[in-house]
Amino acid sequence: SGQTSSFRPDEKIMTSAYWTKDKKEGLHIPVARKALNRILQKSLGIERDEKGLLLSLSEVQELRAAAGGLYDESATIDENDAFPKSLLLAEAILKSALNRKESRGAHTRSDYPDEQESYRKTTVAVYKNGGIHISLAAIEGDPDGH
């Protein structure tokens, strides 16, 4: 399409999510949650492209790796429980968006501007064996069987 992506890695967002206290490195959940919000806002808007989605997926995976097994003593039990799940969900959404190589409804892929009949299906994300797997499934009740 000749367009270049406006997405760039944001080192400030990523590094501000980390903190050091008493020589114990960890993730500060309130700051990391803001970083996650910024990452998703820049790539999951109405107009998207592969480059921006891949960059955001990489940043979410980096946050997810950093959050694995860590406990933020300044956050609540619920925040410590919910944040890794939010990262997993964010990864599933980004992988789903990457898998759909078309524009449909309100979401436009600048690198795939046309609607594709083969994508007239629902996206299914499954967490299995430590990874997220994306597939397409027929829409129940679709008379054309797509």
Tell me what each language-model feature is:
Residues 1-146:
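Glycine- and aromatic-enriched mobile tails/lids
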